[in-house]
Amino acid sequence: VESLNILVITPAFDASLPQSNEAILRQISSVSPRVRVKDGSVLAVAEFRGEPGSREKLDALLAEAEVIYGLFLPRDLRARAPRLKWVQTMSAGVDRFATTDIWNSPVILTGVSGIHATPIGEFVLEFMLMFAKKAPFCFRMQQKHEWARFMPGVLRDKTVGIVGLGSIGREVARLCKAFGMRVMATRRSVKRPARARYVDKLLPAGQLKQLLGESDYVVIATPLTAETNGLIGADEFKAMKPTACIINIGRGGIIDEAALIRALDARQIAGAGLDVTATEPLPPDSRLWDYDNVILTPHVAGGMEDYMKHATDLFCKNLERYLNGKKLLNVVDKDRGY
């Protein structure tokens, strides 16, 4: 029986985490005796840093690979891996692959959609509670050693509008419902109401402004595609309540940041919680750093202590399907972009 060559390229190349990749490689190898796994993580980082000879060494591994499991992969992957048939990324979002040579190729692309729902759902609630309970104000008063009393808000009976009802959007809806909130959402198709169990009002994507106008919190949980790039701009901010906050845990490019800054300056909205920005890291001279009503986190909402295990569990489940000729989970529709 012919061997199946798998190349792993993970971000877990830190010398302080020597067990990370070893555990991943062992787990993948245990799926089948046919599997032959090699680790290209260190070489991929070396190539990124421009270290001499690293590209040639990585090319030797890529040339053998039929399957690649990883993150931060080379943009010319298809050209360098002629035997490649399937790539599974360790992320849910696949927008970075749209500029690689596998996007318009027969190579199957899958992601790990679903594993982020719990940590990101909690992160969204954290943002909402911080705004409702005025946590940024509390932190500033503590730093100034000031005892300034204020009136906190509550989430109960407030309306949350979720833009995008995938696994993350559905988990946000479930958590918000537990807080006694009214839940609205938009999605491309409203033909599957069973997927909207915790949603009080489901709207097609074309009725976004209605959702914006009724929401106290707007949560961006849609992938970045040609359709959603710049989805939230000046007109959308004008449609929002001046007391509403926007939270983005999708991709930075979904929000027009210049329009967001103008909306904050004009007090068209009450605040923004941003785990993602158009440029990452956020440039030091960005004005977004300086607003009292903007909470910034460095694209970490999807993280959790055992992230790599969850991601690799899903890859191994897909690997079993691949070996048995079954349809893979989380196959990316390259025309739609997710």
Which ranges hold each PLM region?
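Rossmann-like adenosine-cofactor binding region
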Residues: 189-287
